[in-house]
Amino acid sequence: MIAELVSSALGLALYLNTLSADFCYDDSRAIKTNQDLLPETPWTHIFYNDFWGTLLTHSGSHKSYRPLCTLSFRLNHAIGGLNPWSYHLVNVLLHAAVTGLFTRFSKALLGDGYWTFMAGLMFASHPIHTEAVAGIVGRADVGASLFFLLSLLCYIKHCSTRGYSARTWGWFLGTGLCAGCSMLWKEQGVTVLAVSAVYDVFVFHRLKMKQILPTIYKRKNLSLFLSISLLTFWGTCLLGARLYWMGNKPPSFSNSDNPAADSDSLLARTLTFLYLPTKNLWLLLCPDTLSFDWSMDAVPLLKTVCDWRNLHTVAFYSGLLLLAYCGLKNPSLEGECNGKALTNGKQNANGHSCHSDVEYRNSEMKPSFASKVENGIKNCVPQRTQLPSTENIVILSLSLLIIPFIPATNLFFYVGFVIAERVLYIPSMGFCLLITVGARALYVKVQKRFLKSLVFYATATLIVFYGVKTAIRNGDWQNEEMLYRSGIKVNPAKAWGNLGNVLKSQSKISEAESAYRNALFYRSNMADMLYNLGLLLQENSRFAEALHYYKLAIGSRPTLASAYLNTGIILMNQGKTEEARRTFLKCSEIPDENLKDPHAHKSSVTSCLYNLGKLYHEQGRYEEALSVYREAIQKMPRHFAPQSLYNMMGEAYMRLSKLPEAEHWYMESLRSKTDHIPAHLTYGKLLALTGRKSEAEKFFLKAIELDPTKGNCYMHYGQFLLEESRLTEAAEMAKKAAELDNTEFDVVFNAAHMLRQASLNEAAEKYYDLAARLRPNYPAALMNLGAILHLNGRLQKAEANYLRALQLKPDDVITQSNLRKLWNIMEKQGLKTSKT
């Protein structure tokens, strides 16, 4: 028990520095924006959606079905909201628990001694686990490992009690249930059933390959046959249910996720897929270079047989075959053991035990004997199974290393990554056992005390180095900026692009732009990076450049709805209404099939329709606007905030004088967001129009209360007061509005108009002048400034503004009439005019 506690304590201690870490990388989509974690989402949705919140049967789903992990995230969210501390705490505790269970499992193979201790400490400290433990989404791998080990330990108990206790099938039931739970944490958990079969055949029964079929069908080995058959049946059921639940279709991924899968060359695909397990093993052996992402060109394709990395592949598979051969070549010392207690494969008889080299190497746990007397002769009857031989442990370790890794090899279907460090969490158990049993064999082999000490201190040093590397790597996972900077040398395109997002969120605009451009230098066709750079430029009023990058993004990925959306908004603001209309329409017609994030796509499509409706609204095409708004309501995803859309529906109905319908949609807007200020203002106008003055005033005042710094609220309230002939109050509201939003033309212009209506002409002149400076080429602003100057007796300035307005709009009848009246006054006063 001491080994388990110490190993767990080390696993806990090494990851304590992750408790202060933030959400990083995939955590954002799996937790921060995952609607399945929210209390308003029915919890049953977890069992129909994938890990990222997309419907599992959707063509764009990653098919990653991990409901128990998502359920744990939801519990975290219910208790602590989006405080990352609690999420990290659960991950660390799970890792400590897995470490303890792995040490307990190792004890069943290695005995209660130094080598079990070494295996546990190595697993606790291995740096390959940092992504799984420090990254919150890695909880799927850690949770799957927990139930993987529980299932395996239950099966070991089943084997040891088979034929002696009725409870043996209770242990088998535990094996099946834990295997199912492991699969519901992460898909590879189901492979524990295959590992259990390997344990039963090669470790517990110590069969070699050619003995399996003849032995398993013998009557006395019926229990072995039954166990293996049930494991196979249950595994088939789990896999069948899993495939059915995801719609019997494999997931689809982009070229950048797994470039080899998209390669046209069969040779390149074959050589690369054969090489990748070699690269994964190297990460286990020497986890010096780790990265948050290994997609894109992080591992260049092997395109020819002359690529020197093929030597690594040959060496890897040769070593693997050699290990397997060494583990399986020795003949079984007892082929038909039927689970009986063994000492070195032979039943102990007449009280004598045989100590071969194999037994010596496993002498940490000796069999216990109970005395019983038969015919006056005292015999010793073995009570428990002797520890497995080194060869047996090698076979089991290889199965632990290889079988859980098989789903990630692209053997049965293409996966959405090149290398994923967290996928190695379960296979690392086999690796740690292999290293431990190898060190133990070397320790036994050498005779000199100095060499034995060298083996001992070398393994201890390795564990120390692993622990130090883990602590350092945890520092990279403290926040996204540190994580992405650490990944630049491995995957520069992805790392620079993600770093640009972080720098932009920190308002480091020039650094963010530089990061985006660096990402595009390494990979120029990344649609997301082109879009992000365009968005950055748009937000900094560099509209021509932004349009250029949006068009490049659309060219790289024609289904990128958000790029169409922002392109249309820029065109609409530039007055290019027909181009904007075509862009919005094209966006609205893009289907959501095979898209990585269908929720984000639907949101962008809904926003495109909303803006198209606004465009029609501004053109006075209210019926068309309503039709587009209805389509937007039909297409919007459940997480879309609909208050602005509902409010615009109300506006359109109000312009069509359909007041009951308008009131309905204003109320819908307020129901969806009770503090939505535009709905308070528009509904207030409707109430005033229908004679409910006191109610209207309450809504205007509520809007001001919600945001006292918003000039538009004072403007609408002032307009209401003006219509009620409360001129003094209206004038105060107008001044307040113009002071707060002195850069907003509409607010300033309307304030000036209200002050003029309140006969406060001097104040009105001040704001008409400001409005004309905000829009120097807007005829109405110049005409109104001319009119107030005319009223205030500043005739020559009034003439100049009238003339400028007529240059911009020569056929304006009101301006022409005002100018003629002005000239008459100027002539009467003997002032020079520009009439001639």
From Swiss-Prot:
Q: What Enzyme Commission number(s) appear in the record?
A: 2.4.1.109
InterPro entries per UniProt: TMTC_DUF1736, TMTC_O-mannosyltransferase, TPR-like_helical_dom_sf, TPR_rpt
In what way does this protein cross or attach to the membrane? Multi-pass membrane protein
Q: One GO term of the cellular component aspect?
A: endoplasmic reticulum membrane
Q: Which reaction does it catalyse?
A: a di-trans,poly-cis-dolichyl beta-D-mannosyl phosphate + L-seryl-[protein] = 3-O-(alpha-D-mannosyl)-L-seryl-[protein] + a di-trans,poly-cis-dolichyl phosphate + H(+); a di-trans,poly-cis-dolichyl beta-D-mannosyl phosphate + L-threonyl-[protein] = 3-O-(alpha-D-mannosyl)-L-threonyl-[protein] + a di-trans,poly-cis-dolichyl phosphate + H(+)
Domain of life per record: Eukaryota
Q: Where is it located?
A: Membrane; Endoplasmic reticulum
A GO MF term? dolichyl-phosphate-mannose-protein mannosyltransferase activity
Please state the pathway this protein functions in, per its UniProt record: Protein modification; protein glycosylation
Pfam families attached here?
A: TMTC_DUF1736, TPR_1, TPR_12, TPR_16, TPR_8
Matches recorded under SMART domains: TPR
Q: Name one GO biological process term.
A: protein O-linked mannosylation
Where does the sequence pass through the membrane? 1-21, 78-98, 108-128, 133-153, 169-184, 185-204, 221-241, 313-333, 393-415, 423-443, 450-470
Keyword Chaperone assigned to the entry: answer is no
Give the matching Gene3D superfamilies.
Tetratricopeptide repeat domain (1.25.40.10)
Instruction: Outline which residue ranges sit on the Extracellular face.
Output: 22-77, 129-132, 242-312, 416-422, 471-836
According to its UniProt record, which protein family does this protein belong to? Belongs to the TMTC family.
Q: Know the name of this protein?
A: Protein O-mannosyl-transferase TMTC2
Q: Which gene encodes it?
A: Tmtc2
